[in-house]
Amino acid sequence: MSDPDAPSSTGDSPTRPNGPRPNVLACPSPTTARFILLVVATLATGLFVGVFVHNMVLGDRWQREVVACASGLPYAEAEGADVLTTWQAWAECTADAEHRRAIFAFAGLAVAAVAAFVIFKRSPRRLERRRRLRPADERFAAARQRFTELSHAAGLTRPPTLMIGPATQRDAFSYGLPGSQRVVMPVAALIRPQCPEFTALAAHELAHVARRDVTVAWAAKSIGYAVAPLLLVPALLAVLTGELSLLTDYVWRAVLLGAVVTLTRAAILRSREHDADLLAARMGSSVPELSAVLAQMPDMRSRHLRHLIANHPYAHRRIAVLDNPASIARASFVDAAAAAFLAGLMPYLIDLVVVPLLTGTAGVGVTDLVAAAVMGPLVGATIGLASWRACLVSRVSGAAVHRGPVAAGVLVGFLLGEAASLAQYGPGGYHPHPSPLLLSVTALSAVGATVATVGLGELWADAAGRLPSARSFWLTAVLVPGLLFTATLWAAMKVQKSLEWGGWGMASLTLTDYFARPTMVVGTLVLALAAAWPIWLARRDTVTPAWLLESGTGRSWPATDRPAARFTVIAGLLAGTCGAAVIAVFRALAGAAADDAQAAQRLYSYVFLAGAVAAAATITVECFWPGRGAGAALISAPVAAVTAMAGLVVINTLLGGTLTWTFAYDIGRQPIGLALLSQTFALSIVAFLPRGRRTSRRIGLAAIVVVATLAILAASAVITARDVLVPIAAKSIASGEPRPLDEDVACGSCRVIGPVTGHANRQYW
């Protein structure tokens, strides 16, 4: 969550900046996406509680059934064992036990959802009884009339119900369910409906209603009340069953999850207050009136972390935001860390449901895709909206956009979230404790996706002057980062699980084979188009879009840096060409492959080489086009990878191989998905380096030398390490007769060579 309540670095009495006033409400704040993330995390906690109850009640039975299934399997330790058949037999045998566990998990999810809904539904009545609230009667007819006028000014066709409390009440607030929302005003303000204080308070609360965030606020509070009892259930069961040794491992996870939920909920409530202040200043009240009312409120200037859990921002901070709205258009470390932490909890928890539910079916392998499809759009929308809005508003305010704190927050959040995942705790847990090295795979890929998201935000901010409305910008800010995080996290989780279950041999196969699927290829190409389109739109100067200005005159909106944009493609082509040159030199020195096993090793090594030159192009583009280069690398990375493999096709043809469209397509698409993962890992390396201010004049010979040098070094390193990167263990193959894929199964640390066996062009690799 962004930290809008942190003390200002420029003092507590900021002055309004000269120039136009940006309309920061043109783009939605990340509040809604963050709220959805909070809801999903709460439901995921319910999943865990359901599984934990199953393990405590039926854990022994589940263990006996699973052990019986395992003991009946025909394990073979010899090289070439039919692992796939063994796994399928085990899945079919344990299907009933796993389905039973899935039922418990869904029951826990239902309990979490019902508990939060009941608390939310009963909150208005309980609040009215506790605070003695009642509708304003005829004594306040003038106030009701003025309130109705302000409601129409706020765009509300049906004014909310005006409520009052006891005479001692000093605060105004809004509450209620959808369709029956109410606004509470202090009696002292109601008796003077024409005074600025009444106008400011009423306009602020009506802004909440107009923005439809009253439901979000009270639902967020209800979720907080529902999470605490849920987290107590496992601890209570452990005490009742005498499993006290489990408490130590559980308590720190529960406390950490509870703390993050509390921080996220508080951030949702704080950010909505700033949004309501800014909207109220434009519909019935004004900045001076609101500032005067806020100045009369009790203020706290905590130098500690107390402001992070406050539901309302401090008065001095609200005044500062009214004076300078651009100050809230940013994403912070805490914002990114909270979103990443909640997302890091989800994959293993989703596994606990999806794996048992699909055990015994052909769809059991989609668990990573389901997890990525759930958390990718949520994290992408949260970080994308915050960072893209910051990039956009910075064009008007002149403030710098800092990606380092956001990237650091994502790194810390994912590491803590994965390590604290409740799915790793409890008897009969599905996943073991992975090592920190394995956890870092997904975390680093998320960092790279974050840097690329900020880079895309810079590119689309350049093109904002050509967009017809704010909606065109913020919808893209939701969809494109969501796709980027979904694809990146799915790939990273696939690699992480491959390392965990089968070591580097399985991970190597995943990296070079699995990511060549059409879905990954199409996703990578769509992301490249999402980076190319704003560069094309921003090819000419324009002016500040009217929808981005609240007041003031628009300024010149500079076009994108054309030499840098051209270098994006040039860097990819040059890096790929250097990679192809390394392949040609290696083929000339090493000669033809001795057998099918060596041919397979070479082919998959070339795929790794394509990923390596994609990383080289990414680093170069980001270094010579700081900020925007991270987004533009979505173009240069696949261009570099495809160019390198196109070089392989040319070499194959020159040596006498057969050139067909099928062969060219199969070879060309092989590294595209890997290029995306290589790009994110490369960006994670440069994420925390200071960004320079290089201009187009410096993109010349130096840039060409750098990209060529990096590409040659990376490609040469892959060729040198091919025995490590692509371990091969092939059976003897009858000459002249290609063997089916399932007859060439590698050992646990080696690779399947079936796709290469009998290939017409294998002798030219």
Locate the predicted segments by residue.
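Hydrophobic or amphipathic, alpha-helical segments that drive membrane association/targeting
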Residues: 2-163, 226-250, 254, 258-270, ...
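Short pre-active-site segment immediately N-terminal to the catalytic Zn-binding motif
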Residues: 187-200
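Extracytosolic and intramembrane catalytic regions of membrane-associated proteins
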Residues: 741, 746-751, 755-765
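Solvent-exposed, extramembrane regions of membrane proteins
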Residues: 205-209, 311-312, 320-325, 594-600
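Active-site recognition of the HExxH zinc-binding catalytic motif
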Residues: 185, 200-208, 212-213, 217, ...
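Active-site-proximal gating segments in proteases and membrane effectors
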Residues: 152-182, 262-271, 275, 280-339
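Post-HEXXH active-site segment of zinc metalloproteases
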Residues: 212-242, 290-294
